[in-house]
């Protein structure tokens, strides 16, 4: 039985009350779903996986509990094993190696989506439309900025996915720009004029 996106959202909202965590799940979903379309994969399955990857984080914010203790909850809700495995694999300490394209994509998009959100929020218009790969790479060098986001995971995620880091950053920015309003990162696309 395949779960729908709406059912995944219901589970996410049941267990995740923080608006920021909900938006993080949505940002990761947006990036992962864009890759599903690019790779010709099952967009619903990939979206569901991304939406649920941190559903248990408020209950179990520390390693190794997250996502291990959430997995039985998802199993009891009928979430397919391949989705649960991908969710487990997004945690480096889980011992579950990332093998499938879904698993690699989820890992590659998780930290990056959070970082792109953080970069967007420090822009004057608080908008993802003001973000580009160059500004993201510059912020990656600032260890005090979004210090909880692993730069190593962002770099390794792109490498494991077989994608150039700058291309990966730009791809995810473009995906998030298309749905910026849902993320609270809409602002307005910047207008440039030449004189």
What are these regions (language model features)?
Residues 19, 43, 80-81, 147, ...:
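Residue-level detector of short coil/turn "hinge" positions at structural boundaries
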């Amino acid at each position: 039985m395949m779960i729908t996106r709406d059912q995944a959202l219901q589970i996410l909202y049941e267990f995740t009350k923080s608006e920021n965590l909900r938006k993080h799940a949505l940002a990761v979903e947006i990036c992962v779903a864009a890759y599903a379309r690019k790779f010709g994969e099952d967009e619903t399955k990939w979206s569901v996986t991304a939406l649920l990857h941190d559903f248990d984080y408020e209950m179990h914010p520390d390693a190794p509990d997250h996502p291990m203790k959430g997995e039985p909850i998802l199993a009891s809700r009928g979430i397919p094993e391949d989705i649960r495995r991908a969710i487990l694999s997004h945690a480096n300490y889980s011992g579950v190696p990332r093998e499938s394209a879904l698993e690699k994509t989820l890992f590659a998009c998780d930290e990056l989506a959070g970082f792109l959100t953080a970069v967007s929020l420090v822009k004057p218009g608080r908008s993802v439309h003001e973000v580009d790969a160059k500004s993201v790479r510059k912020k990656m060098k600032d260890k005090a900025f979004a210090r909880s986001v692993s730069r190593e995971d962002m770099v390794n995620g792109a490498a494991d996915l077989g994608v150039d880091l700058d291309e990966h950053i730009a791809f995810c920015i473009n995906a998030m720009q298309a749905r910026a309003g849902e993320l609270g990162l809409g602002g307005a696309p910047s207008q440039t004029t030449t004189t």
